[in-house]
């Protein structure tokens, strides 16, 4: 990182460059040198007039002909591309007639009383149950929701928001700009589709947004008589089940996915929490279906204890040198040992072969090198309380509870000298792609989807529709500024921030990592620029909402890692209502929340003391005595009514939310809090409105990007924070040829340019450079799209198997009688034994009945009456013998069932269910491990001109058939061998009770699983 500039440099000069310095400029491959006096306005104005753009022979007329492409150079191609020709007008025309139908109903609906409005919900439900299509109900349903929103929230959805709702109802992706009210749009189709009674899931990216949306816009469907549920991380299964049964349920993508996997690991019907899927609305759909698509959802169980090998490997990795002992491929995120690396590692470890399967040193050493080179602290992860926490590269948030697999997380822990946690083994997994494709009707909304429309259509069959904005978007996206080295880039970023800050404009600076945001923060501190930092560090995460709420204030400077899913709009002048809520929250929460409540769950240490204190600088003014007294009285009445420190944080937040919204209030305490909130908000608004005028006059919010992301879409998300709802604004990206994206994916062209330029801190402008940078970003997009597509194709193989296994498991879990399933297992197992020991093509005279009988009786001792003569008489043909053995297998099961039921009525049913579920879970877990190894192995077969995917399908299918057969065999064998044992309670318990103990069946809790570990190794006799 470069040294910061002194104040005079910031004010008067380009970073470290004299106004008369020579420039080296590249134009279409030609390096030019020019000496010309530069004015600071031309450098930092709307275009860099000093750089040279050449046409043919420098002809001005030729240059004008090419000006469209050349003027967009400096990498500023983004703004040209993404303003796009489609501004949503075609969508407006497409839905104009339906919007008109909704508007015609407005007068009629607005004349209804509250109770009459609720009755419309019942009438619409009845029409839906009679089979009337949702499309025919849409105009009235949307009109009802619009009116309810006016009454409850004080917000009337615009026509463009109705269009957004119609797009979502149609099962498409609605691209809506930031600030256009996506949260409100979601309740329109959610209400309509909930009328069927089958449930609707509204999916958001984090718990905070799910709770906010449920508490805020969820009031509208609640007002109309629908039940609205919310799923949060720490809820019990009972709470989850209750909330999933609501008409509309707000939930995060990870909670929903993990609940699905947990349901498929449940051992009783009571543990199931989900209902059948019906309709799903995904907020920030690109974040969930594209950014998160590379990371499958995994539920894992503990494996063996961690090994000391991790620490030894970490020491070796730290001693080894790059390009001497190992090479790194940053694009593929892989490392390889060189010949010297192999030899030195084997010598240090005193082993003959690094790849000896008994020691597996190679995987430990390679993971340690990956941890050293590719997984960087404050970029890929942070450390909190001696734990390595992964940072989401797309949102900048900590991914609580997530761990890297295959020993990589342990390698990072060893690198940092932290305690190594247990390794894990996969119990259940699914990709977001295949999970959400289970919904019969799926839709989503985001501010940036059109650039990924091909992926949405090819994988999810979802069309992207651009919804028009309510007011024209007037944000100005400036051309990018490109430097050779990062030093020049960071100097220019500081100058840009300083210049904008002095005009009073609000500035939002986007960085790609925690490390970058901290380094830039240090530069700004040394330059004397007051600012806020929003990244994954815990001290910043806790203040996220308040930081974003003040990001639009006069002269505010905010540094933030990726802004996707932040959920709080940046309002110019500051968000008065949000500030008022924070002030009321600051007073209320410490007095009503239980001191032990919180999300911290640890047996090692007590939870940290919770505080709701807000930095006083956040508020636009000190609260007047009158308003402070009003707030104190309202809080005191709440304490008296609810009790001193008697609520959970979630309950208190919910009541505070009701107090700060515009819906009807019956509760006296909520009414007092509402009055206090409105009074505080009004006082703050007087100041924020004045600030807003000044910020707008100065030019609005200015967004500074410091690096291109792996997708143009994420760049657009950052730009989209400015210019909301017709506000003025601007954006500009500052790039360096040393940025990761260009260094890793740029190829020879960009490397050549880096060698050609000798000045680090002059901006470069060239059509060729722009093309090269844009091509590098396109390469990244295509590369990661290919990864997601490959993951999807491979997971589809697993998905069909997963569906079959989970269907079989659910059948065993919910069936009242498992007899038909067990009979099916018995018959198929007899078929397997017969085929393995005789076979349909074996001549009759070669049939070995002794061998067959031995194997049958090994499985079922109840068939000890079988003799070769009996089989000869019963089975004159292979088919006849098959039918006879099937019948005997079936009869043996029924006989065993009768024996057990006589001993303990109802026990057999519990035993059967337990045996089926435990065998499915155990063998499915082993199957997942086997498929993982197969997937790794087939990758190398491409060198032999064999398609890895086809190889994976074939091998995976064979493994799956064998697993399903093994489940059947294990279950029926265990049932045939099952012997209930009556056991006594502990003598200690007897002495405590002072009474003799009763005899109880060992299966009153879980039946003993006899034979699962000692079943015959095969169905064929030796």
Swiss-Prot record:
Major site of localization recorded for this protein: plastid
Gene Ontology terms, MF aspect: ATP binding; chloroplast protein-transporting ATPase activity
Source organism: Arabidopsis thaliana
Listed name of the protein: Protein translocase subunit SECA1, chloroplastic
Upper lineage: Eukaryota, Viridiplantae, Streptophyta, Embryophyta, Tracheophyta
Residues bearing PTM N-acetylserine: 73
Tissue expression summary: Expressed in green tissues, including cotyledons, rosette and cauline leaves, and sepals. Also detected at the base and the tip of the trichome.
CDD domains: DEXDc_SecA (cd17928), SF2_C_secA (cd18803)
Reaction(s) the record says it catalyses: ATP + H2O + chloroplast-proteinSide 1 = ADP + phosphate + chloroplast-proteinSide 2
EC number: 7.4.2.4
SUPFAM superfamilies (UniProt xref): Helical scaffold and wing domains of SecA, P-loop containing nucleoside triphosphate hydrolases, Pre-protein crosslinking domain of SecA
Keyword Nucleus: no
């Amino acid at each position: 990182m470069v040294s910061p500039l002194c104040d005079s440099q910031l004010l008067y000069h380009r970073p470290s460059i004299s106004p008369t310095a020579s420039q080296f400029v590249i134009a279409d491959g030609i390096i030019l040198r020019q000496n010309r006096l530069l004015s600071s306005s031309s450098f930092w104005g709307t275009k860099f007039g000093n750089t040279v753009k050449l046409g043919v022979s420098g002809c001005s007329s030729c240059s004008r002909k090419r000006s469209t492409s050349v003027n967009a150079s400096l990498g500023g191609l983004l703004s040209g591309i993404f303003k796009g020709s489609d501004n949503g007008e075609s969508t407006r025309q497409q839905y104009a007639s339906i919007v008109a139908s909704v508007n015609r109903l407005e007068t009629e609906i607005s004349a209804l009383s509250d109770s009459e409005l609720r009755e419309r919900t019942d009438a619409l439900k009845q029409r839906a149950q009679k089979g009337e299509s949702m499309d025919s109900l849409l105009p009235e349903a949307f009109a009802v929701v619009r009116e309810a929103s006016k009454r409850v929230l004080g917000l009337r959805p615009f026509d463009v928001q109705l269009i957004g709702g119609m797009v979502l109802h149609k099962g498409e992706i609605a691209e809506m700009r930031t600030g256009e009210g996506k949260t409100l749009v979601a309740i329109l189709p959610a209400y309509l589709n909930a009328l069927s009674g089958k449930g609707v899931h509204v999916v958001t990216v984090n718990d905070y947004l799910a709770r906010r949306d449920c508490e805020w816009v969820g009031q509208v469907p609640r007002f109309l008589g629908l039940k609205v549920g919310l799923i949060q991380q720490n809820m019990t299964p009972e709470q989850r089940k209750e909330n999933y049964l609501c008409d509309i349920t707000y939930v995060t993508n990870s909670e929903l996915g993990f609940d699905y996997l947990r349901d498929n690991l449940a051992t009783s019907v009571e543990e199931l929490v989900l209902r059948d899927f019906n309709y799903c609305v995904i907020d920030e759909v690109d974040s969930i279906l594209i950014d998160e698509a590379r990371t499958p959802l995994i539920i894992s169980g503990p494996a063996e204890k961690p090994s000391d090998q991790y620490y030894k490997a970490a020491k070796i990795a730290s001693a080894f040198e790059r390009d001497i002992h190992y090479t790194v491929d940053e694009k593929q995120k892989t490392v390889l040992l060189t010949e010297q690396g192999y030899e030195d590692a084997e010598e240090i470890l005193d082993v003959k072969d690094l790849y000896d399967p008994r020691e597996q040193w190679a995987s430990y050493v390679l993971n340690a090198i990956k941890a050293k080179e590719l997984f960087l602290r404050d970029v890929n992860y942070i450390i909190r309380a001696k734990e390595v926490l992964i940072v989401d590269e797309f949102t900048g948030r900590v991914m609580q509870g997530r761990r890297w697999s295959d020993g990589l997380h342990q390698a990072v822990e060893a690198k940092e000298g932290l305690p190594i946690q247990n390794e894990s083994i996969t119990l259940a997994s699914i990709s977001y792609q295949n999970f959400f494709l289970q919904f019969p009707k799926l839709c989503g909304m985001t501010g940036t989807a059109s650039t990924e429309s091909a992926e949405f259509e090819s994988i999810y069959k979802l069309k992207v529709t651009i919804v028009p904005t309510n007011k024209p978007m007037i944000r100005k996206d400036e051309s990018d500024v490109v430097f050779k080295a990062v030093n020049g880039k960071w100097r220019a970023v500081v100058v840009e921030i300083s210049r904008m800050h002095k005009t009073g404009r609000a500035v939002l600076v986007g960085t790609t990592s925690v490390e970058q945001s901290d380094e830039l923060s240090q530069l700004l501190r040394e330059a004397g620029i007051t600012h806020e930092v929003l990244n994954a560090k815990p001290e910043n995460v806790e203040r996220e909402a308040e930081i974003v709420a003040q990001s639009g204030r006069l002269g505010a400077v905010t540094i933030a890692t990726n802004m996707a899913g932040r959920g709080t709009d940046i309002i110019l002048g500051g968000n008065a209502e949000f500030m008022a809520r924070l002030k009321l929250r600051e007073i209320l929460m410490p007095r009503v929340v239980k001191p032990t409540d919180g999300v911290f769950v640890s047996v090692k240490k007590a939870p940290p003391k919770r505080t709701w204190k807000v930095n006083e600088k956040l508020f636009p003014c000190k609260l007047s005595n009158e308003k402070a007294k009003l707030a104190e009285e309202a809080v005191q009445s709440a304490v008296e009514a609810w009790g001193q420190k008697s609520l959970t944080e979630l309950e208190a937040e919910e009541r505070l939310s009701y107090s700060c919204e515009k819906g009807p209030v019956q509760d006296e305490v909520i009414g007092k809090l509402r009055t206090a909130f409105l009074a505080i908000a009004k006082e703050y608004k007087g100041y924020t409105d004045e600030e807003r005028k000044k910020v707008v006059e100065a030019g609005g919010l200015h967004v500074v990007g410091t690096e291109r992301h792996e997708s143009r879409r994420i760049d657009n998300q950052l730009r989209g924070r400015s210019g909301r709802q017709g506000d003025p604004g601007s954006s500009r990206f500052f790039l360096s040829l040393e940025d990761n994206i260009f260094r890793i994916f740029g190829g020879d062209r960009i490397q050549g340019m880096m060698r050609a330029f000798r000045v680090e801190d002059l901006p470069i402008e060239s059509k060729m450079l722009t093309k090269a940078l844009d091509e590098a970003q396109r390469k990244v997009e295509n590369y990661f799209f290919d990864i997601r597509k490959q993951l999807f194709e491979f997971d589809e193989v697993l998905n069909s198997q997963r569906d079959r296994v989970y269907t079989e498991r659910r059948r065993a879990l919910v069936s009242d009688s498992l007899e038909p399933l067990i009979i099916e297992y018995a018959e198929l197992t007899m078929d397997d034994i017969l085929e393995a020991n005789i076979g349909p093509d074996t001549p009759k005279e070669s049939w070995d009945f002794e061998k067959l009988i031995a194997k049958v009786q090994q499985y079922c001792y109840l068939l000890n009456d079988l003799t070769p003569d009996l089989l000869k008489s019963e089975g004159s043909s292979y088919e006849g013998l098959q039918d006879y053995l099937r019948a005997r297998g079936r009869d043996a099961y029924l006989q065993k069932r009768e024996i057990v039921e006589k001993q303990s009525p109802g026990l057999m049913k519990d035993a059967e269910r337990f045996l089926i579920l435990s065998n499915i879970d155990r063998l499915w877990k082993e199957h997942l491990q086997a498929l993982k190894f197969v997937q790794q192995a087939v990758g190398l077969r491409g060198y032999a001109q064999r398609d890895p995917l086809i190889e994976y399908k074939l091998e995976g299918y064979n493994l799956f058939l064998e697993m399903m057969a093994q489940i059947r065999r294990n279950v029926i064998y265990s049932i045939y061998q099952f012997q209930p044992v009556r056991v006594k309670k502990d003598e200690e318990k007897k002495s405590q009770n002072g009474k003799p103990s009763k005899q109880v069946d060992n299966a009153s809790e879980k039946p003993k699983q006899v034979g699962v570990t000692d079943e015959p190794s095969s169905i064929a006799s030796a």
